[in-house]
Amino acid sequence: MGPVMLDVASYELDAEEREILKHPLVGGLILFSRNFHDAAQLRELVRQIRAASHERLVVAVDQEGGRVQRFRDGFTRLPEAQSFAAINDAATAAQLAQDAGWLMAAEMISMDIDISFAPVLDIGHVSAAIGERSFHSDPQQALKMAECFIRGMHSAGMKTTGKHFPGHGAVTADSHKETPRDNRPLAEIRTHDMVIFRELIARRLLDAIMPAHVIYTEADARPASGSSYWLQTILRQELGFDGIIFSDDLSMEGAAIMGSYAERGQASLDAGCDMILVCNNRQGAVSVLDNLSPVKADQLACLYHSGQFDRQALMASPRWQQANKALTALSERWDAHKSRG
């Protein structure tokens, strides 16, 4: 299995995509809203992807909930992470967060999708890129909700990806559009943003981590996604993380400071990423495949889903029906809360 995760253009594979998926450096594929028409079409697309590749790929999606939910029609409307904090009863909030993790994972596994890149572990809501995707502005409250969500995902048979290490929540800039700079002292980042990562790693609840395309100026001139200081010295050595490290999408403007697409890919792997994402730019992806040093990433097989869900049986189950009803209601209440200002 190779270390590159790519995307495809539409509802089904074209001839060029079938050839690209056979490339030995390709190990994963991420799906977007443009790949989704309905559940039957999505299941067929995943079947085509599986058939086209020589080795089983890691098939991924961003199905966090709220504004980052690629598949909507026919799937449960998942609430924003921040909405759990608006529930007055702590036990109810914890149960709903766990239900959300389980239901999201079960619905994706029923499509033969291995992972959703979740949960978001950034602290606070000031960042344009994060906002309501964050569970809470208080690290301990965010930790409680994230742990519940993670346990739900694991109970369904899906691995977790904590993002965006060491924390994207304090910068207002959007790394999709520019390279944000976090000028805070390292001590503040450690005691505020990194607490949730440190605790979840210590509890062995994170299977993968995705670093931020953010420059932390007190630590390194490179974004964390291309920084051996953050990925090796801090994440691997200090925190003892032994899971998978993904880059965020290298087509984002936050990664452009690392050079051409090929240079971004090589820099991220050299810094310590196990798999790099190159999306929304076919020419850039081909450049990465043409220029990247040959490398295997067979450790990524640990990310395959271990659950089994038939879609019709899942949706007929009392657990799904109860969770679907409660989470849909929470989404609607949160929307009403926002509309009132």
From Swiss-Prot:
Q: Which of this chain's residues are annotated to bind substrate?
A: D62, R70, R133, K163, H164
| Alphabetical UniProt keywords | Cell cycle, Cell division, Cell shape, Cell wall biogenesis/degradation, Cytoplasm, Glycosidase, Hydrolase, Peptidoglycan synthesis
Pathway info: Cell wall biogenesis; peptidoglycan recycling
A Pfam short name? Glyco_hydro_3
Q: By its UniProt entry, which SUPFAM superfamilies does this protein fall under?
A: (Trans)glycosidases (SSF51445)
**Catalytic positions?**
H176, D248
InterPro entries annotated for this entry? Answer: Beta_hexosaminidase_bac, Glyco_hydro_3_AS, Glyco_hydro_3_N, Glyco_hydro_3_N_sf, Glycoside_hydrolase_SF, NagZ_Beta-hexosaminidase
Role played: Plays a role in peptidoglycan recycling by cleaving the terminal beta-1,4-linked N-acetylglucosamine (GlcNAc) from peptide-linked peptidoglycan fragments, giving rise to free GlcNAc, anhydro-N-acetylmuramic acid and anhydro-N-acetylmuramic acid-linked peptides.
Under which name does UniProt file this protein? Answer: Beta-hexosaminidase
